[in-house]
């Protein structure tokens, strides 16, 4: 299969680390022009330099904060307008909310999570969807979580917001399909990212055990008996962004080694 993304422009959220960074590298390797989104200028600059060293594709960066959706919308729209750029593919990806029980979460924690995920993604949609409709092409891929299918213990706020994003996505897939815009979700399971390492560290501290013991326990719950690498999730994103997935719309695709028990 030839995943040729030459002349496609891809907006990558959370592009300096984990699944976002793995996706950026993979899409660049297949010919895409990239706009990397993150909130750390130094990391953005470093990542852009790394990509520019291995590809002649256009690599651009934009410092945005997903906790401030109004500011994100303004920055992105001005960035695209000032350079007459259009976006073909969006990878919505940002860090998860803090862990904890849902019944102990404050309303501010829920509001913050909704802003960081659902509202920010909706703001991005508002900026890019008009051009996608005019060109009769678009791919919107949301990196969320297997908690959409099976809530995860100790991640109450995350479970709540991921479900909201999944339903937002499904609704959009019904509304935008006629414009040849597909909207799909990728649901990573336990993946070797800084987010997972944070969860492991916090769980180990609470249980007063070694971090490796917690990590091994997570891996033991997966039929494949290991934790995923970010690149394995990125390949699923690449497929959904490609022409090979032109008739795949409105799905939740688990990339979890079979850990989720539901169909």
Where are these regions (language model features)?
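Conserved NAD(P)H cofactor-binding loop of Rossmann-fold oxidoreductase domains
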Residues: 93-98, 258
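Short C-terminal tail/terminal secondary-structure segment
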Residues: 4, 19, 150, 237-238, ...
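Catalytic Tyr-X3-Lys loop
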Residues: 96, 103-123, 137, 141, ...
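Conserved glycine-rich Rossmann-like NAD(P)H-binding loop of the short-chain dehydrogenase/reductase
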Residues: 32-47
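Conserved glycine-rich cofactor-binding loop
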Residues: 9, 16-18
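Short, small/polar-rich loop/turn modules that mediate ligand/substrate recognition or access, typified
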Residues: 177, 182, 248-250
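Catalytic loop of short-chain dehydrogenase/reductase
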Residues: 141-165, 169-178, 190-191
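A conserved structural motif in NAD(P)-dependent oxidoreductases
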Residues: 210-211, 222-233
């Amino acid at each position: 299969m030839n995943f040729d993304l030459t002349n496609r422009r891809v907006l990558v959220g959370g592009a300096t680390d984990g699944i976002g960074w793995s996706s950026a590298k993979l899409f660049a390797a297949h010919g895409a022009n990239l706009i990397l989104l993150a909130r750390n200028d130094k990391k953005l600059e470093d990542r852009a330099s790394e990509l520019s060293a291995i590809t002649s594709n256009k690599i651009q960066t934009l410092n945005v904060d997903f906790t401030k959706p109004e500011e994100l919308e303004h920055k992105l729209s001005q960035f695209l307008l000032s350079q007459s750029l259009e976006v073909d593919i969006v990878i919505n990806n940002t860090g998860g909310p803090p862990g904890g029980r849902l019944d102990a979460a404050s309303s501010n924690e829920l509001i913050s999570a909704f802003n960081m995920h659902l509202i920010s993604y909706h703001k991005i949609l508002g900026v890019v969807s008009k051009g996608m409709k005019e060109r009769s092409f678009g791919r919107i891929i949301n990196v969320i979580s297997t908690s959409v299918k099976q809530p995860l213990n100790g991640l109450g706020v995350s479970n709540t917001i991921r479900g909201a994003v999944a339903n937002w996505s499904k609704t959009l897939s019904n509304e935008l399909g006629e414009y040849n815009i597909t909207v799909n979700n990728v649901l990573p399971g336990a993946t070797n990212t800084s987010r997972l390492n944070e969860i492991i560290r916090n769980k180990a501290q609470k249980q007063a055990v070694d971090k490796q013991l917690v990590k091994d326990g997570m891996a033991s719950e997966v039929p494949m008996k290991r934790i995923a690498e970010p690149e394995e999730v990125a390949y699923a994103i690449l497929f959904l962004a490609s022409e090979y997935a032109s008739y795949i719309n409105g799905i939740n695709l688990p990339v979890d080694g079979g850990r989720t028990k539901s169909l």
